[in-house]
Design a protein with these regions (language model features):
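Short, well-structured hydrophobic secondary-structure segments
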Residues: 37-73
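Conserved NAD+-utilizing ADP-ribose enzyme module
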Residues: 1-2, 9-34, 59-61, 70-195
Length: 195
């Protein structure tokens, strides 16, 4: 499966030196930006173990990559604000990872997990209103179970774009580790802080 992972240049250096790279939680941008990502990341790890197999010894968190960006399965446009705003030199590493070693999910709907929200997955407003009413009527203990089960809808990545529901526009990929032999191409980008 062709994917694109955005990493600081240091990751590319480590990958070239060691032949393999695993997420270092102490240096991972999103794990150190003031938000509490432990619970959602641990949930994703549990889903990966259930769906693609146990993590290798020593792996704590997965490597993240793009599969689909703005409805297209191609390298993300590094000129967009999301990428241009990064300080320091970064790399977009094009990789080919075996399909059975990758778990795909909808990046926009991943925010239901990140924010600890119930995800109804409704495709139209009436369905949403019914789902929300049924969810809100549940006892608190049951709500937690139903909410966590609802998050599994993020793995539905078939493109849908309606007035009420969208999925598949941005598809992210997670896998346990990155190896040098998976690399097809590296593109450098980024900037340094102004004075």
């Amino acid at each position: 499966m062709l994917l694109w992972t955005i990493q600081p240049e240091e990751v590319w250096r480590i990958l070239r030196r060691d032949g393999v790279y695993r997420c270092n939680p102490d240096k991972a941008m999103h794990l150190n930006d003031g938000w509490d990502y432990d619970a959602p990341y641990n949930w994703m790890v549990a889903q990966m173990e259930k769906r693609i197999g146990k993590r290798p010894e020593g792996v704590i968190y997965p490597i993240w990559a793009w599969h689909t960006y703005n409805w297209k399965h191609k390298k993300p446009d590094l000129r967009t604000d999301w990428f241009r705003g990064r300080y320091g030199v970064h790399t977009c590493i094009e990789i080919d990872v075996p399909d059975n070693a990758v778990l795909l999910s909808d990046e926009e709907n991943w925010h239901f997990v990140l924010n600890d929200w119930y995800f109804s997955g409704a495709k139209f407003e009436e369905e949403y209103n019914r789902d929300e009413a049924a969810y809100e009527a549940l006892p608190e203990g049951k709500k937690i179970m139903v909410k966590k089960k609802s998050w599994e809808r993020i793995f539905e990545v078939e493109p849908i774009d309606t007035e009420w529901h969208r999925q598949g526009c941005y598809v992210q990929a997670v896998f346990w580790e990155l190896s040098l032999e998976q690399v097809k191409k590296v593109t450098w980008f980024g900037r340094t802080k102004g004075i």
